[in-house]
């Protein structure tokens, strides 16, 4: 899988933190997020899912994710935003790949991406959250175009 190394600014994000199987929590989180964004007239810069755990090592019921929108750095939570978190995705060097997800199989491109990164001779993955940015509305289009971000650092030879 093709990817490039990019220097990312930190992102300020607002949304929901969920724990449980991702195929359930991510969908539920975005439903909550859409209702909150619509009710508060927030104009998101990006729609993002943040993944904290490795599903090969963490039981499904303990998997953590955030479903969030990117907001300006000066953003404050509006009143009546119970359960909404305001947090940051750290900046730094990230490997970034683009994929098209068909049939809601989000795991497949991630595994392909990780396999490619494991073979990279110049960079290694960091134990930081990974995240994906949605480039379209898959609910309308029938597929999702996503950007996948994995924190990396140069390998020391």
Swiss-Prot record:
**InterPro entries assigned to the protein according to its UniProt record, in alphabetical order:** AraC_E-bd, DNA_gyrase_inhibitor, DNA_gyrase_inhibitor_GyrI, GyrI-like, Reg_factor_effector_dom_sf
Instruction: Give the span(s) annotated as Required for interaction with DNA gyrase and inhibition of its activity.
Output: 89-96
- According to the record, the signal peptide region is none
Q: Which GO terms describe its biological process?
A: DNA damage response; negative regulation of DNA-templated DNA replication
Q: What is its main location?
A: cytoplasm
Coiled-coil annotated spans: none
Q: Which GO terms describe its cellular component?
A: cytoplasm
Q: What induces it?
A: By DNA-damaging agents and by the entry of cells into the stationary growth phase.
Q: What GO MF terms are annotated?
A: DNA topoisomerase type II (double strand cut, ATP-hydrolyzing) inhibitor activity
State if Hydrolase is listed as a keyword: no
Q: Write out the annotated subcellular location.
A: Cytoplasm
What are the entry keywords? Cytoplasm, Stress response
**Cystine bridges:** none
Annotated family: Belongs to the DNA gyrase inhibitor family.
Describe the function of this protein.
Inhibits the supercoiling activity of DNA gyrase. Acts by inhibiting DNA gyrase at an early step, prior to (or at the step of) binding of DNA by the gyrase. It protects cells against toxins that target DNA gyrase, by inhibiting activity of these toxins and reducing the formation of lethal double-strand breaks in the cell. Protects cells against the natural plasmid-encoded toxins microcin B17 (MccB17) and CcdB, and synthetic quinolones. Can also protect cells against alkylating agents that act independently of DNA gyrase, suggesting a more general role in protecting cells against DNA damage.
Quaternary structure and interacting proteins, as annotated: Interacts with DNA gyrase. Interacts preferentially with the holoenzyme composed of GyrA and GyrB, but can also weakly interact with the individual GyrA and GyrB subunits.
Name of the protein described by the UniProt record: DNA gyrase inhibitor
Which organism's genome codes for this protein?
A: Escherichia coli (strain K12)
Upper classification of the source organism reads: Bacteria, Pseudomonadati, Pseudomonadota, Gammaproteobacteria, Enterobacterales
Q: Gene name on record?
A: sbmC
